[in-house]
Design a protein with these regions (language model features):
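Mid-domain alpha/beta scaffold segments of enzyme catalytic cores
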Residues: 1-276
Length: 276
């Protein structure tokens, strides 16, 4: 299969709803792009059902994830997650993890831990990867390294840690991948450092659309993945000493990087095509 742009974490239904609320014409056309292979995430049963239907009607290149989000650690969604696993309708569990960004979320820590542990166990039993959401809770993720090592792949959405922390997970035996997104376009230090220096076989790209917008934007779009990749490619080219590259050399470099990230996406989500 020809290498594609890959969006490792996006909210398709949320994006369409946001476009509708802003009275944007053709929300479907503005959401789907034939050059992008994506993983669409949901954390409520009803929304998953709608999103799945929309994706099936408008794209051939997608997978789905479902998880109990740490900002809304509701145990009532666990039976539905188990149902999806039984029916093999999802490629990953998540987003799940910890969010201690403010006092409100800190007060739900015990509930977050409970649904996190349930999802870790389900990931091990189903042999599916997990998509991790983590804000101000990296120490809690490190506490579960023994469990994470038993999981097929651990995909860190919105990676905000250092390269040292990323490599620490890898050295401890976690099959981890780290998502670079629009934080790169914002100039976020952690994203810049990781994008420039982390081994390329551990990097994924994402938009988190319609979220993670820039200051001048009202929302993000899945097609922003092309901007993310472009900046990532330029940054890595400079880091690798290709600052004086000619157009052809850079084009070849960018295509090789795109191919590498596509391969990472397939490995992280265990995607197999006929003949592969």
């Amino acid at each position: 299969m020809t290498p594609m742009y890959t969006d490792a974490h996006v909210h398709i239904l949320d994006t369409i709803e946001e476009l509708n609320s802003q009275n944007i014409e053709n929300p479907i056309l503005n959401t789907f792009d034939k050059e992008i292979f994506f993983c669409a995430s949901a954390n409520e049963a009803g929304r998953f059902e709608i999103q799945e239907k929309i994706c099936r009607e408008n794209s051939e290149h997608f997978i789905l994830s479902f998880g109990i989000h740490p900002q809304c650690p509701i145990e009532n969604e666990i039976p539905y997650l188990e149902k999806l696993l039984t029916e093999k309708r999802i490629a990953a569990i998540g987003e799940c993890g910890f969010d201690l960004f403010d006092e409100h979320y800190k007060n739900t820590l015990e509930a977050q831990k409970k649904v996190w542990n349930v999802q870790l166990n389900l990931a091990q039993k189903s042999n599916l990867p997990i998509v991790v959401h983590c804000r101000k809770g990296m120490h809690l993720i490190f506490d579960d390294v023994k469990s994470l090592k038993k999981i097929n792949a651990v995909i860190f959405h919105g990676w905000a840690g250092s390269v040292t922390e990323a490599r620490s997970f890898l050295k401890k035996g976690v099959n981890a991948y780290f998502c670079i997104g629009k934080g790169l376009l914002r100039g976020q230090k952690a994203q810049l450092e990781t994008a420039a220096n982390l081994e390329k076989d551990r990097i994924l790209t994402e938009t988190d659309a319609p979220y993670m917008s820039l200051k001048e934007e009202k929302f993000s779009l899945p097609t922003d993945i092309k901007k993310v990749f472009s900046v990532l490619a330029e940054l890595r080219a400079q880091t690798e000493g290709l600052s004086n590259y000619d157009g052809k050399t850079y084009k070849n470099y960018a295509e090789e990087l795109k191919d590498s990230i596509f391969e990472n996406f397939k490995k992280a989500y265990n995607i197999r095509f006929d003949g592969n």
